[in-house]
């Protein structure tokens, strides 16, 4: 869960997430053939879903299995060949569609499994980047790095102050004397793929391109509040002004927090 820093991770800003005590658990067996067999205890009605490591591509009817398949595809794209099939059983206690990164959890878990099965030399940070790459390129969701990073790099009783532009980070102890963090579920299902997420990112990227015509920046996260107010007239659409303003001001709020 992110404590502060919303819509900043894909704008080169800072985020302040922490990992949760709930997650996704899996049992995997490497096969001698090319067959993939997936089963989720959370979606028992779907039964065993079969695929192959050969010619991996997203399939709408496959639903959740696109996440582990995407990570397998991403490993291959990064030069780490997944040569054998797999039987994969998953169980998760993250409320599905609640905005608590269940898909990123599946991605990172799949990365852990592949690293273990094949002996790939990849760090936890690399696994986070591979998970993001798979979600961007295989599943078509232009997410930032925050969810996968928090899951792969989370530390007990700590949050992570992460600069998404440089990937520099530090752990910040969370010791709340006499207080608790409460996460509530509204029961409104949420998925990045069918939300306005990609649209928001496109709007921010368009605003950045307009600002880059008048000031030398790499991302919206490079701007101070004062700089934004000085140069915001370069953004031609009022909606894009709102999107960019949020990214800039939220980034500064995160730094102060």
Regions found by a protein language model. Name each.
Residues 9, 150, 253-254:
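Hydrophobic side chains within alpha-helical segments
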Residues 25-61, 158-257:
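C-terminal nucleotide
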Residues 1-100, 104, 108-124, 129-133, ...:
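ATP-binding N-lobe of GHMP and related small-molecule kinases
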């Amino acid at each position: 869960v992110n404590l502060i820093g919303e819509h900043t991770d894909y704008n080169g800003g800072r985020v302040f997430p922490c990992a949760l005590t709930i997650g996704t658990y899996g049992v995997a067996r490497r096969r001698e053939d090319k067959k993939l067999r997936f089963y989720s205890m959370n979606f028992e009605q779907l039964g065993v879903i079969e695929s192959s490591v050969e010619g991996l591509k997203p399939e709408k009817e496959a639903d959740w299995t696109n996440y582990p398949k995407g990570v397998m595809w991403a490993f291959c794209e990064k030069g780490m060949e997944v040569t054998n099939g797999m039987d994969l059983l998953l169980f998760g206690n993250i409320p599905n569609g609640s905005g608590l990164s269940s898909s990123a959890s599946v991605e990172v878990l799949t990365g852990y499994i592949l690293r273990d099965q094949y002996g790939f030399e990849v760090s936890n940070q690399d696994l986070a980047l591979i998970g993001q790459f798979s979600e961007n390129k295989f599943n078509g969701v232009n997410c930032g790095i925050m969810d996968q990073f928090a899951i792969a790099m989370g530390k007990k009783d700590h949050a992570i102050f992460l600069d998404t532009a440089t990937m520099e980070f530090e752990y910040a102890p969370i010791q709340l004397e006499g207080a608790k963090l409460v996460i509530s579920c509204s029961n409104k299902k949420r998925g990045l793929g069918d939300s306005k997420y990609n649209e928001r990112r496109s709007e921010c990227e368009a605003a950045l391109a307009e600002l880059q015509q008048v000031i030398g920046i790499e991302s919206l996260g490079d701007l101070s509040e004062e700089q934004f107010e000085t140069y915001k007239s370069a953004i031609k659409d009022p909606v894009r002004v709102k999107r960019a303003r949020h990214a800039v001001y939220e980034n500064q709020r995160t730094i102060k927090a």
